């Protein structure tokens, strides 16, 4: 996966990811310690989703291009998806939607049913995608 901003590039590969500035110099790198199952990046921020299938748990790693230490958030369940939007990481679990700032602080949480697999935030609305339906709900930070 490749994400380009005015200040540089974020490159996500199979075993590691890295940030590069406009001069091509690496400004940050993270080597994966688990099985990468998803990720998202926007404006120099990245959220990586790792899964431990034997323990049925997930971990979210939050990265900032400025070289801050990675923040890891562990979940006692499998996380379905993650997206970076509006300077936050949005996480869809089996039971809810959670929002995290990149310092690892949980900003909000709302319950949702387990029938959704993906989502998209547009303005103050959250669109939840299931196998055969799309639902919209209000979701302000």
Regions found by a protein language model. Name each.
Residues 96-116:
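C-terminal structured domain segments
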Residues 24-31, 67-74, 105-111:
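A short beta-strand motif characteristic of beta-propeller blades
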Residues 49-56, 60-61, 67-99:
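Loop/turn-rich, solvent-exposed surfaces of beta-rich toroidal or solenoidal domains
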Residues 1-54, 59-61:
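Acidic, serine/threonine- and glycine-rich low-complexity intrinsically disordered segments
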Residues 111-141:
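Blade-level signature of beta-propeller repeat domains, shared across WD40, Kelch, NHL, RCC1
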Residues 5-6, 13-15, 42, 56, ...:
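Short loop/turn segments that connect beta-strands within the blades of beta-propeller domains
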Residues 1-7, 31-44, 74-87, 113-125:
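Repeated scaffold domains used in trafficking and secretory/extracellular systems
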Residues 14-20, 55-62, 96-101, 133-140:
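Structural motif
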